[in-house]
Structure formats: C-alpha cells, structure tokens
Amino acid sequence: MPHPHNKKIQSFWLITGIIFIAFNLRPAITSVGPVISSIRAELHMSNGAAGFLTALPLLSFAVLSPLAPKLGQRLGNERTLWLGLVILLIGVLTRSTGYTAALFFGTALIGVGIAIGNVLLPSLIKHKYPEKPGIMISLYTTSMNIFAALASGVSVPLATQMNGGWKQAFLLWGGLALLALLIWIPQLRHRDTANQTMKLQSSSIWASKMAWYVTIFMGLQSFLFYSSIAWFPEILRSHGIDTATAGWMVSLMQFASLPSTFLTPVLADRVKQQRGIVAALASVYLIGLCGLLAGGSHTLLAIWMIIIGIGQGSSISLALTLIGLRSENAQQAAALSGMSQSFGYLLAAVGPIFVGYLFDQTHSWTMPIVLLIAALIVMGAAGQGAGRDRYIFQSEKQRNSA
C-alpha cells in the first residue's frame, strides 16, 4: 500500500497534469479567429477556405474520436494522452512555418492531438474520481476555458508586436504543450485506466437513444462555440470595432464563461435531472445571440458577448458532465465520449464552413446569426432528452425498478 505522503504527491501531479492538458485543448484553435483576416490577406484565402481552416481541427476530432478509446485500451489512457500532447506539439511547430500546405497539415495534426485529450480526459476522470466527477470536470473545463480566452485576447497583440507576425504568435503555444508533456511524465508508469477489465460492444452505444441526445447536445454546443470563435471577430468588425478590440471582446466572452463553466458541473452533479439547467442556459444563450443580431453600441455589444459567454460556458461544461452522469463506469464514459465527440464534432465542423459560405453568398452577417439561433434551439431540445435521469444502456423498466 502506498505511503499516505506518496499518495498525496501522486494525486498532486495527477491533478496538475490534468489541468495542464486542459490548458492545451483550446489555445491552438482559439488563437486563429482574431488573426484570420491577416492569414487570409497574406495567403490570399477566401472566407470559405478560412472557414475550412478553422473547421479542420473539428474534422480531425470527428475522425479520431472513435479511435481514441481503442488506443486508450491498448496503451493506457495516461500514455495515450502523452502521445496526444506530442502530436499537438508537432502540429504547432509545423503550422508555424507559415507555408500554406504546412498551415493546413499542422492544423490537422493539432486536431488529432486535441481529439485524444478531449475523449480520454472525461474517461480518466470518471475512473480516478468516480465519487466526485462534477468538481473535477469543473476544474478541467474551467482550466480549458481560461487559456481559450487568453489565446483569443493576446493573438492580435502578439502577432502585431512580433517580427514573425501570426506565425510566431502561433509558435508560443508549443511551449505550453511542451510544459504539459513534462508534467505528465510521472503518469506514464500507470496503465490502470487501460480499460481491459470490461468489454463494451462499441456498436451497441450507437443504438442508445440517450447516447444520441448527449451526442447532439455536444455537437451543437461545439457548432456554436467554434462558429463564434471563428467569425465573431469579423462580425464585431462589421459593427465598426477594430481588429484588436474585437479579439479582446471575444476573449471577454470566454472569460465571462468561467463562472458558469465551473458552477454548472457542480450543480448538475447534485440534481437527478439536468433539464432545468438546460432550459436556463439555452434561454441566456438565446438572449445574447438575439442581442448580437440586433447590434447596438460598442458597450451593448460587449454586454451581448458577456451573456453569450455565460450560456457558452454552461453548455460546454454540461456536455462534458453528461458524459459521466449518463455512464455507469469509465468504459461506458470512454465509449460515449468517443461517440459524442466523433459525430458531434463532425456536426460542429460544418459550422465555421457554412457560416463563412453564408456570408460569402449574402454579404451580411444576419443569416449566419439566424443559423446559430436555430442550432441553439435544437441543442436545447436535445438537452431536454440528455438531461433525464437515465444511463445510456438503461431502459425505462430498469430505471423504475432501481
């Protein structure tokens, strides 16, 4: 039996490692939106091509998410997460060379690395902290959103002040990945989350109605998040806001999401059904999007961004919390995480591309914002199904007899 002091040290490094992996799951993506106009001008891209660049990590998520649980079973979640960080670092270095082909290839690699973390961290948390997944999901999602917000805010100032422009600004996030790699090294000797003790028929989860509710909720909240990260800076610029300020306003949106990001999983963990939480966050989100559609002064636009951020923070943290709440064990959590983030991110990948395409066709941001509102309404409906007190493989009869 490990000495209590050693156990505390191991727990410290595990929690620190989870936090630093979470730090890396968004900045390489959210740093792109504020400087997309500079990239587009330098590399002569259309809005559609720029939208595809933003969607590329999501396509990587969609392809890799079903494979990540299987890789975790083979290598262990700890080693697979470390491998994901290595791939992320290589992607950041490749993208920062500035060549068009390298930009797209590096971005795809970044998506592969992040996909592994996206899928396996909820499973690892479910395994390591089965009695208190809510607080750990809060810690994980809040850490993720802090650096997502920071990356949005500092991208333009860094690109402006550095000789290498946006290329050198992107390179800085490689240092964060390297730091996480080093911190996670103590976990490499563990394989206890390799999920070898139980077999789960991967095909069965696709027949679960509850799994589909969670997947659609996950997919549409991602659709909304990544569309906003990609195009809100441009929407704000259309209201007369300069590029740097637009970047900081998107950053403000993400910082505003932090309280709801942290509190939502804790609250969701304490109630049997999460349908009321879904209704509340969807209502707040809707107010913000309708406000953005209406426009207004710079101050009013900042208020709409804050309101959107509150809804956004709740939706991402609740989506991740539902993976654990609707699963009976770590194996089910890994399978549900893989499904929801595969089909879900495939759906999300359509967002930035289609929003860019709609703007190219209409030369107005009205229809793209209306599309986001429609996606939010469907997300709320799926959330009502996902918020019921039921496991993914639990029938109504089993639930009533429990």
Swiss-Prot record:
Topology in membrane: Multi-pass membrane protein
Species the sequence originates in: Bacillus subtilis (strain 168)
Locations listed in the record: Cell membrane
Name used for this protein in its record: Uncharacterized transporter YycB
Sequence similarity: Belongs to the major facilitator superfamily. Cyanate porter (TC 2.A.1.17) family.
Swiss-Prot/TrEMBL keywords: Cell membrane, Membrane, Transmembrane, Transmembrane helix, Transport
Entries under PANTHER family matching the protein: 2-NITROIMIDAZOLE TRANSPORTER, PTHR23523
Main location: membrane
Keyword Flavoprotein found: no
Cellular component per GO, a single term: plasma membrane
UniProt GO MF annotations: transmembrane transporter activity
CDD domains: MFS_NIMT_CynX_like
Disulfide bond sites: none
Cell membrane as UniProt keyword: yes
Transmembrane segments: 12-32, 48-68, 80-100, 101-121, 134-154, 168-188, 212-232, 248-268, 291-311, 339-359, 367-387
Factors inducing expression: Negatively regulated by TnrA under nitrogen-limited conditions.
One Pfam family this sequence matches: MFS_1
Superkingdom assignment: Bacteria
